[in-house]
Amino acid sequence: MKRYTIIGNGVAAVGCIEGIRSVDARGPITVISREQYPAYCRPLISYMLEGRADQEQMPYRDAAFYERMGCDVLLGGDAVGIDPEARAVELGDGSQVGYDALCIATGSSPFVPPFSGLDTVASKHALMTLDDALGLDAAIDATSRVLIVGAGLIGLKCAEGICGRVASITVCDLADRVLSSILDAECAALMQARLEEQGIRLMLGDSVERFEGGLAHMKGGEDVAFDVLVLAVGVRANTALVSQAGGEVDRGIIVDNHMRTSIPGVFAAGDCAQGYDVSLGAKRVLAIMPNAYMQGHAAGVCMAGGDEVFDTGIPMNSIGFFGLHAMTAGTYEGACYEERGEGSIKRLFTEDGLLKGFILIGCDERAGIYTSLIRERTPLDSIDFEALKKAATTTAFSAERRAQMFGEAV
């Protein structure tokens, strides 16, 4: 009977478990989880800070999931190495867990820049895990002055989550706009205005030179006093287990379309993996939940001896701040179709007869249709793209195409 081991317990791990069980109903599965909790929905941690969700709403699967799937879960387990020759995972307590097929689903960790004086800050936090959110929740009160370093998705969701619960929020970033990795200047300005309407101070094009206790000396010359610091500068894929075992890594763990690493019997999925991006035509880390699950599922199927390919990954973000919603996907290359409304922008990017990407601000209804066009590399001359530019409806497709893509009756 084949033995399966999964290091990590997030969305990719759940996908892997379900992929394994779609092929092999009996082989033992061991899940090694550094965190003390069953798999949970990580994007909800900012909503927990806001009071829109509680800890009972966090689980990604029901309480009976692991038992139903026949999993042995080692909560609080620390995998410190893998031995490909012995087919074993080494744990921090000196014990080992054997495997016939192994999936690395270790996710990513916050990047902490080497700020001078960071060790003098008494209350500093990240916002990546449930424990991070619980720690930040306990650290703030109505008198807290909060400084957030980083105006990306994590930093801004943190700001939204604690807005109204603290005395002040300042967000700084060296970039000249918020969400600089996914929005252009004009689209970012809409988001910036919404954030500033809520009293959040944004210091863009500026960051910390050094810390001195509860004082941040900024590169621009200003001093910012704070009580609580949140570092949200970015994340790095957790690749060490594979690199230390001699496997190929880059920004993430290099995988093929079956999610196999360069080490025999070892697969990888989720935020730690560097897989194929169909919109780019190359491999890169795609750190979003849908890709993590699908990568995990493909890994699980292949670990169990089946054949599943995941080669339709794309960068994609669905975000919202204080009621203003945005969705982005793909790359922003080629010709741009633009449509504007009051407080909304739609941009569709096309190249070589394909939809390559989009930015939708305040008008993201049925964005899944645009996403499907990118994933499936649908030739635009096979559909009524002029109609789709105005409204993303399935009537722009032929009856046969609707049946193929969306399961609608012909």
Task: Please provide the spans of the model-predicted regions.
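Rossmann-like dinucleotide-binding cores of NAD(P)H-dependent redox enzymes
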Residues: P59, L153-E209, N291, F310-S318, ...
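Glycine-rich dinucleotide-binding loop and its adjacent helix/turn
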Residues: T106-R165
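Short hydrophobic core segments
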Residues: I7, V97-G107, V149, F226-G234, ...
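FAD-site-proximal beta/loop scaffold in flavoenzymes
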Residues: T120-D141, G214-H217, E222-A298
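Mid-to-C-terminal Rossmann-like scaffold of FAD/NAD(P)H-dependent oxidoreductases
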Residues: K2, S22, C272-G368
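C-terminal catalytic lobe of FAD-dependent flavoproteins
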Residues: R3, V224-E248, F322-R402
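A conserved beta-strand/loop element that lines the FAD pocket in flavoprotein oxidoreductases
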Residues: E67-D83, E196-V208
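Beta1-alpha1 glycine-rich phosphate/pyrophosphate-binding loop at the start
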Residues: K2-D72, A159-L183, I369
